[in-house]
Swiss-Prot record:
Name the UniProt record assigns to this protein: M-oxotoxin-Ot1c
UniProt entry keywords in alphabetical sequence: Antibiotic, Antimicrobial, Cytolysis, Hemolysis, Membrane, Secreted, Target cell membrane, Target membrane, Toxin
Family: Belongs to the cationic peptide 02 (oxyopinin-2) family.
Major subcellular site: secreted
UniProt keyword Secreted present: yes
Role, per record: Disrupts cell membranes, particularly those rich in phosphocholine, through formation of pores. Has antimicrobial activity, hemolytic activity and insecticidal activity.
Regions that span the bilayer: none
Annotated GO CC locations: extracellular region; membrane; other organism cell membrane
Record GO biological process: defense response to bacterium; killing of cells of another organism
Source species taxonomy: Eukaryota, Metazoa, Ecdysozoa, Arthropoda, Chelicerata
This protein's record includes keyword Membrane: yes
Subcellular location: Secreted; Target cell membrane
A GO molecular function held by the record: toxin activity
Amino acid sequence: FRGLAKLLKIGLKSFARVLKKILPKAAKAGKSLAKSLADENAIRQQNQ
């Protein structure tokens, strides 16, 4: 059990490190995606 807990802790630490690297990029991508969707909606409303 103790070894398993240690492995889990190490796994969580490396997972957190990967998340910290990925999250800023994901946030940027999400923002640009949301912006493009909002722009599309605005264009669609103007065309009606």
